Amino acid sequence: MTVSVGLAGDWHGNVSWAMSCIRRFAAQGTSTIYHLGDFGLWPGGTGNYYLKTLHRACDHRGIDMFIVLGNHEDYHQAAAMHLDAQGWLFLENYPRFRFAPRGHTWVDAQGARFAALGGAGSIDRNTRKIGVDWWPQEELTQFDCDRLVANVNSQHWPRVDVMLTHDAPAGLRRFGMTARPAWFTPEVEDYCAIQRTRLRHAMDEVLPRWLVHGHWHDYFRDSWDGLSASGTDYRCEVLGLAADGMRGNAVIAEVIPGFGLGEITEFLP
C-alpha cells in the first residue's frame, strides 16, 4: 500500500508562501507534510505569529507537519520542547507540529522506514549574532550521526526507505561556492564541509533508498552510487528542494515501503 505526502524545503518564516503551500497540499488531499528545515522557528512576536498562523491553517485542514530542523532555527526554543511517546519533539500549543530529534527513526502507517538527521552549517555565520539569528546548536555533530546509526541498527533495518535531512551529503557534484563574498572565511567553509562529510558517512551506514534535503535553495535530482561502510555498493536517489519563492520548493511524493519514493509531482503555490 502506498500513500502520498507533501515535502517542502526552506520556508524561512515566510507566512504568505508557507500558507500558499499548505493550501495547495490540502487541495491535493495531502494530510502529512514533511518539512526539510529552515522552517521558521524564530524567537519573538514574528516567530509566534508564524507558528500560530500556520498551525491554525493545518488544524483547519486536518494536516500534520513533521519538521526536520535546519540551521536557521531558534535552538533555545527547540531545547524547551517536550518529547512524545513516539520520540517526536513538540511545542505544547502546536500539537499539529512535530519536530524530529537528530537521528530519529520511525515507520509510517504503511510500513515505510524513515530517518531524520537535521542541522547544517551556516556559511554566513560571521554576519550573524549568536542567540539572535545564529545558534551553535545548528551543527550536525558526530554524536548526532552515531545516534542515527544506533537507532537504525537497533531495529535491524537492512536499509532506510526515506532519509530526511536539511543539508546535502558531501560528494554531490553540483554543490560548492563559486563566489567568495567579503564575509567569507575558509574556516567557516571547513566547518560547513565537515558536517556534510559526517552526513555522507552516516548515509553510508544506514543506506537510504531515497534522501530528501533542503538548505541549498535549489531543486535538484540525482542518483548516488555509494559504497557502504561494509564495502558493498548501493544506490540512493537524491531529491533537493528549493527555498520559499522558488520553483521546486514543494512537491507531493508517493511513499512506497521497501522502495522509497515513487511518483513526484512538483507544484507552484
Give, region by region, the residue ranges found by the protein language model.
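Short loop/turn motifs at secondary-structure junctions
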Residues: G29-T30, R113, R159, L207
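Binuclear metal-dependent phosphoesterase catalytic core
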Residues: T105-D108, D204, D218-P269
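A structural motif corresponding to the C-terminal end of an alpha-helix
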Residues: A57-D64, E92-F97, S154-V160, R198-L211
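Core catalytic region of metal-dependent phosphoesterases/phosphodiesterases
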Residues: A8, N14-A109
